[in-house]
């Protein structure tokens, strides 16, 4: 993605660790019932968020910061148990 919405090095690391490109995070937002929650970890003074949503019948989580009106993804992966519980509790 040439629009600067993610760091190419972080994209490569995410692909190696989670087998997902960071751009996959956009698909999580396509879930009409996606959940956005503040991330517990605050790094470098940035307010981070998690988006949790279903893609292809599986639950995924993207960690991101807002850049204007667009998310800049830091990590994209399958959701953990706590994120699954939060998603289903909100629904």
Question: How would you label these PLM feature ranges?
Answer:
Residues 1-91:
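Ribonuclease/tRNase effector modules and their secretory precursors
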